């Protein structure tokens, strides 16, 4: 009697696999509907068992049904044979891989959530620091209208305010934290901790430079005797040529500003040398003020000596020989204002006349 072994096809309920005997390596596929007498539905469901992960239509069982061989060979021509234990082990590894992937994804979600909070907090700090920088720059623009002593006091207060606020340390902390977490794009702010930190340091350096300049101007003023009125005139001259209100002058306007104060540079190299002493690129107001305070007394004394020397060899008979008619009229009008009349002779103390120009 021929013994038939029947295995149900999980993927197609209309078919089963029939092994006629143990020597039969190639099972026959039978239509259930056409052969109702060979199998009942309950038997099919019982035998489906452990074949839930593989498709019988793509492989063959061994004679003892304990191993499974893929019907499709690999590129090298080999066929893989798997036991049910091997398949179970692969399933365990697959479950472990899925668990690891889920854990990694959860970690990434948590990291992105933390990064978003960091970006939001950093944006608040950046906005605060940016507002402080804007306020400091506005106060610096107003310093030029103050006396030197008031400028010095205001600059010292501004520097202390920025240094004691701890903003530089906060910016360093946020920059280090965001770099360590590879955060290079903040959706809450277009500014970066590094950019704001650089701007803050530049602002501090500018205030320190202005403070040194003001202190030097005070020392030069006290040494040379420049008055507050003269300082005010220097500022007015600078503001007149600084038509764009940038706080600095280019080469051409700086030259005009100095010449308007009585500095006549006959040699071009002399002007360039003077400008290089201030700033090789632009000529800012505090540099200009420092230069004027330092050199104004010398300039006045040189002019004073030149006028005295000219008057020593000048009398009424030589006026027409030494000056044009227009210059002579201007000169005589100055003399008339300071002249002292004694009978029919007009005389003038030339030192008093020279002092009248100042």
From Swiss-Prot:
Keywords: Calcium, Metal-binding
EF-hand domain: residues covered: 229-264
Gene3D superfamilies xref list: EF-hand (1.10.238.10)
GO molecular function: calcium ion binding
PROSITE patterns (UniProt xref): EF_HAND_2
Amino acids binding Ca(2+): 242, 246, 248, 253
Matches recorded under SUPFAM superfamilies: EF-hand
Transmembrane segments: none
Tree of life domain: Eukaryota
Name of protein: Uncharacterized calcium-binding protein C07A9.5
